[in-house]
Design a protein with these regions (language model features):
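FAD-binding subdomain of flavoenzyme oxidoreductases
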Residues: 61
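Phosphate-binding/catalytic loop of phosphoryl-transfer enzymes
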Residues: 64, 68-164, 298-305
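ATP-binding/phosphotransfer module of carbohydrate and carboxylate kinases, centering on a glycine-rich
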Residues: 1-57, 102-109, 151-305
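Short acidic capping loops at alpha-helix termini that bridge into adjacent secondary structure
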Residues: 56-58, 87-88
């Protein structure tokens, strides 16, 4: 039996950690839809049990996207973990595990800008989330935000000025622009397909494409605005940042860090994966930070195995 397990659950599946110094001991590719997050997660846990039939632990912490907003029953998930792995369980958000992986019990703001976007801070016995509202209402600066803005900008530039460089690059990846309105109306273009266009925008920016440079600069700025607001709300100067946009785009990262510097915030890259934060929370349910998370409804702990 393993003492503790940390499970990181994202939109594409889950990763399992048993040692902070080692890579994931298991990876389950099992997409988690927003509509069926709880059922998809439980199915992924069953897949993990089949892949690792001898896996057991005294306590598991699972950090998942959508914990707070998608109607997931923490009690149902903890019951499955107890049944499958014989373990006590802590269920929380991946924003909490990302924060804990970097800051532990220290104070600061974790900003993750990937397919989605959010800032989460803890300081002075206060917790604050900014954004993380999904593609329809938020995710400012995210890969999806970049991809959609690029599609809109590409069509607009082509129609108004005849500049088709960005449009041609996007069409090469996602098909003719003339088909986009119909595909959006039929919901045939997924959030992940739109988000994947951010990589093309980043590539074009490196070759000097002006539209791409402007989009990525704005992405960094709006992401930084979330960080600044979050830091101000809890009263901290420390920011950790990560995610595919900030780590993969020099232009977005540059504008992000410039805004933070203008507000005298100290920034450092998030190094440890969220799953390590989950592992550390599993091991630390008696410490004051984890007790605070539970008291604020940011984590659910079922201590009856």
């Amino acid at each position: 039996m393993t003492d503790f397990l940390g499970i990181d659950v994202g939109a594409s599946g889950l990763r399992v950690f048993s040692d902070a110094k080692l890579p994931a001991i298991a990876v389950i590719d099992a997409p988690n839809s927003s509509k069926n997050r709880e059922q998809d997660l439980i199915a992924a846990l069953h897949s993990l049990s089949k892949q690792k039939p001898q896996l057991s632990a005294s306590r598991v912490c699972l950090g998942m996207s959508g914990f707070s907003s998608l109607g997931v029953s923490a009690a149902a998930v903890t019951a499955e973990i107890r049944e499958l792995f014989g373990a006590e369980a802590v269920i929380t958000s991946d924003m909490v595990t990302a924060h804990y992986a970097h800051f532990g019990e220290s104070e600061g703001v974790a900003v993750v800008i990937g397919t989605g976007a959010l800032a989460f801070g803890i300081a002075n016995r206060k917790a604050q989330r900014i954004d993380g509202l999904g593609a329809s209402l938020g995710d400012f600066g995210s890969a999806y935000w970049i991809g959609l803005k690029a599609m809109r900008r590409a069509i607009r530039d082509s129609e108004l000025t005849g500049d088709s460089d960005l449009l041609s690059a996007l069409e090469a990846q996602t098909g003719p622009a003339a088909e986009w309105p119909k595909r959006f109306a039929r919901q045939e273009i997924t959030e992940f397909e739109v988000a994947s266009l951010s990589r093309k925008v980043s590539e074009l920016s490196e070759s000097g494409n002006q539209a791409s440079l402007e989009i990525l600069t704005e992405a960094g700025i709006v992401a930084a605005e979330s960080a600044v607001a979050c830091a101000s709300a809890v009263g901290t100067k420390s920011v950790g940042y990560g995610g595919s946009v900030l780590l993969g785009s020099e232009k977005a990262r540059e504008s992000f860090l410039d805004v933070l510097a203008d507000h005298d915030l100290e920034a450092a890259e998030l190094k440890a994966p969220s799953g390590i934060g989950a592992l550390q929370i599993a091991a630390g349910v008696e410490n004051e930070r984890v007790k605070f998370l539970i008291s604020q409804g940011l984590a659910h702990f079922d201590g009856h195995s």
